[in-house]
């Protein structure tokens, strides 16, 4: 699956040390939620071991269980575009995703300005 043109062009304009955050919004065909999660879970599990990975949070719309949003932060935008998106562990997800979507996914790229976290037991 191809990256959004804005993500690719932004990567060429940034230095290798700039952090980047992405939001990816996906609207699935009804009944595809379980398959989507089965394909995405190993990708998220593998991503956490990448050296430029900072964090990822998967969200599900409480009003529409077929809508998901992934928030990712990476230490190096160019690495995401040139290396991470082409990792073998993403292949099954990329290959199957188009048939699960009811509309094109929406990708936005952000530059983190501030990060505040509290880590709660049980989350």
Residue ranges of predicted features:
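Short, surface-exposed ligand-recognition loops at beta-strand->loop->(often short) alpha-helix junctions
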Residues: 27-36
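A general structural signal for short secondary-structure boundary/capping elements
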Residues: 68-73, 101-106, 114-121
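Short, well-ordered beta-strand segments in beta-rich or mixed alpha/beta enzyme
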Residues: 20-27, 57-86, 123
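An amphipathic, aromatic/His-enriched active-site/gating alpha helix that lines ligand/cofactor pockets
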Residues: 1-5, 15, 45-46, 50-54, ...
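Short, solvent-exposed alpha-helical surface patches in well-structured domains
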Residues: 35-38, 82
């Amino acid at each position: 699956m191809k990256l959004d043109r804005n993500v690719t062009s932004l990567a060429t304009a940034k230095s290798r040390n700039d952090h980047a955050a992405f939001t990816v919004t996906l609207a699935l065909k009804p009944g595809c939620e379980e398959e989507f999660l089965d394909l995405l879970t190993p990708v998220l599990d593998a991503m956490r071991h990448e050296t430029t990975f900072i964090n990822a949070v998967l969200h599900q719309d409480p009003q529409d269980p077929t809508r998901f949003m992934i928030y990712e932060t990476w230490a190096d935008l160019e690495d995401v575009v040139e290396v991470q998106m082409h990792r073998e562990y993403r292949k099954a997800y990329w290959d199957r995703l188009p048939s699960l979507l009811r509309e094109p996914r929406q990708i936005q790229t952000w530059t983190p300005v501030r990060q505040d976290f509290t880590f709660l037991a049980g989350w």
